[in-house]
Amino acid sequence: MSGQNQKTDKRIAWPIIIMNFTGVYDYEAFARNNKFIWLDCRHLYGTEGYCDRDGTLALKRMIADYPAEGVHFIDSGNYHYLTKFWTDKLETPFSLIVFDHHPDMQPPLFDNILSCGSWVKDILDHNNNCKKVIIVGASDKLIQAVPKGYERQVRFYSETTLMHEEGCCLLYTSPSPRDRSLSR
């Protein structure tokens, strides 16, 4: 076979990184893959729900040698703010898609302390590469509480928008990507 006819596999194997704060992944069969990178965060202080200065420094040191690209399992919702540290490493424009019941766009309760409730707002306020945020599944009540001024950057698909009557949603009925037919 000539070199011109050979296809080169251009897939890149991005790392799968598990950030273990609570031990929750100890009970998950999928996490036992020896190719996954485990970061043991159980010894860190100042990281649960809120991330203080020491916690921020420790976490940034911990992820410094890993690329932002990849899949990052970041424990419970108390640690979603870690997404900010990963996106801070991106050097090209990006859109952030968040699947959560909460928009995580509250002003910080304490002066400049990142929290599980403020990290999306912090990314929008400080990361010039973040061009758009799409939040899927947030409650209508919490969306109404989002501070004004983010309408051009944030798109919400609320839990109400996503609700549907049984039997009226679109389903893919064929597993083949070439022959996907939609049924109602």
Predicted regions and their residues:
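N-terminal glycine-rich anion-binding loop in soluble enzyme alpha/beta folds
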Residues: 2-53
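Active-site flanking residues adjacent to catalytic metal/cofactor-binding acidic residues
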Residues: 19, 99, 178, 184
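Active-site histidine-anchored catalytic micro-motif
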Residues: 74-141
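Short, hydrophobic/glycine-enriched beta-strand segments
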Residues: 13-22, 72-75, 95-98
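Short, charged/polar "capping" segments at the starts of alpha-helices
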Residues: 26-29, 141-146
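Active-site-flanking structural segment that lines cofactor/substrate pockets
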Residues: 42-69, 76
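Active-site glycine-rich loop that binds ribose-phosphate moieties when present
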Residues: 112-122, 141-142, 156-171
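Conserved small/polar residues in nucleotide/adenosyl-binding loops
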Residues: 172-179
